[in-house]
């Protein structure tokens, strides 16, 4: 999947290409294989009992990181496709119609997310550093992810007007999402490591929330704004950490195992949720604030198959949600929890295509 070389919000750049060992765990309970009433038969068959009325919204290219507007009526997503050679941010209706460009069309963009009033969108872009698409990393150093230091975070009207730059410091600033009060949480390398920060919706009052050795990022608020969920890993001193820092100083990252964590919105009470092995990423809270959905390859010995899983916030009751043989990732619940949007390779006409799907969620 080519799009995995470039994604920023949640590892896409490398995670799927890795062959990571996956540890077995008695923490996981697969759901009963009973078909939902309106489940559409696909490559995954009737095992996905949490899904009803699955609809494919995009057709061809590399489409991912689709997120609902606050009123649940629209989606913002990023795409590379014919006529769009480098990731750009678009919005569309829930039926896949009325796609409109939101970003400038220059550079590479990632991680579009609606403000609570649905009048603006936040996203990251490299266009201020160079109007051209930044090159992918060389694989001479192994499978690595580019952490582009030209990424900065912007606010823009939903029609693409009134672009405002929110970050302007050296280093990678991206992976921005927004809480119900309009506060932004994002990932930055401004202090020499991949850490999570928050700031006001206009870019002020920047606060560092994590302070660990290792790649913390991909943060999302809970629906009530009290907690943040993210993927990460703390790397102890030693050869692995030295390699991590050496690459990061060159704007690169070699992903290793990743787990899901939660913390309070101010960075306190950081707690590890999963201990599965493999790479778990792209977590998002269910609106009830008690469950987290995420993507992981922990169950696949070769590490290439990513499925969606759900876990209680205390780490219990891991439940497998999808049964696809390739990639499912970037899940997000609608504000009322009635729908789920995600990206998948399933049923692709062209090998490597990644498309956006939406389903009715079955409790």
Model-derived features with residue positions:
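C-terminal motif of bacterial Sec signal peptides marking the signal peptidase cleavage site
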Residues: 20-22
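Hydrophobic beta-strand positions that form the internal "hydrophobic ladder"
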Residues: 75-76, 121, 184-185, 228, ...
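Bacterial N-terminal signal peptides that target proteins for export
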Residues: 2-12
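Multi-bladed beta-propeller domains
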Residues: 39-62, 92-108, 156-172, 199-215, ...
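Bacterial signal peptide processing site
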Residues: 24-26
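Residue-level detector of Asp-centered blade-edge/turn motifs that repeat once per structural unit
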Residues: 70-71, 116-117, 179-181, 223-224, ...
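A flexible loop/linker signature enriched in serine peptidases of the S9 family
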Residues: 59-62, 79-89, 104-109, 124-152, ...
């Amino acid at each position: 999947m080519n799009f995995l070389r470039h994604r920023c919000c949640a590892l896409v750049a490398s995670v799927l290409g890795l062959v990571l060992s996956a540890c077995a765990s008695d923490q996981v309970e697969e759901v009963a294989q009973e078909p939902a009433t309106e489940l559409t038969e696909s490559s995954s068959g009737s095992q996905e009992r949490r899904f009803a009325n699955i609809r494919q919204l995009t057709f061809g290219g590399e489409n991912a990181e689709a997120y609902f507007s606050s009123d649940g009526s629209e989606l913002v997503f990023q795409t590379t496709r014919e006529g769009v050679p480098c990731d750009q941010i678009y919005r569309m209706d829930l039926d896949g119609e009325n796609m409109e460009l939101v970003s400038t069309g220059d550079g590479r963009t990632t991680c579009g997310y609606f403000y609570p009033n649905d009048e603006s969108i936040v996203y990251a872009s490299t266009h201020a550093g160079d109007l051209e698409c930044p090159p992918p990393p060389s694989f001479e150093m192994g499978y690595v992810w580019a952490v582009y230091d030209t990424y900065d975070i912007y606010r823009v009207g939903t029609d693409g007007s009134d672009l405002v730059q929110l970050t302007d410091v050296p280093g990678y600033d991206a992976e921005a999402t927004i809480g119900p009060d309009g506060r932004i949480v994002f990932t930055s390398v401004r202090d020499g490591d991949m850490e999570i920060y928050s700031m006001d919706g206009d870019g002020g009052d920047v606060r560092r929330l994590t302070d660990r050795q290792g790649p913390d990022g991909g943060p999302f608020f809970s629906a009530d704004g009290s907690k943040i969920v993210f993927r990460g890993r703390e790397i102890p001193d030693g050869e692995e950490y030295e390699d991590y820092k050496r690459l990061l100083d060159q704007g690169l990252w070699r992903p290793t195992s990743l787990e899901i964590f939660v913390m309070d919105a101010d960075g306190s009470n950081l707690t590890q949720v999963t201990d599965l092995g493999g790479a778990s990423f792209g977590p998002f809270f269910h609106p009830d604030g008690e469950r987290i959905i995420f993507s992981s390859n922990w169950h696949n010995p070769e590490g290439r198959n990513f499925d969606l899983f759900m876990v209680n916030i205390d780490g219990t009751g891991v439940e497998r949600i999808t049964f696809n043989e390739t990639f499912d990732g970037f899940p997000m619940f609608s504000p009322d929890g009635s729908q789920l949007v995600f990206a998948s390779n399933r049923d692709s006409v062209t090998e490597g295509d990644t498309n956006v799907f939406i389903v009715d969620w079955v409790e």
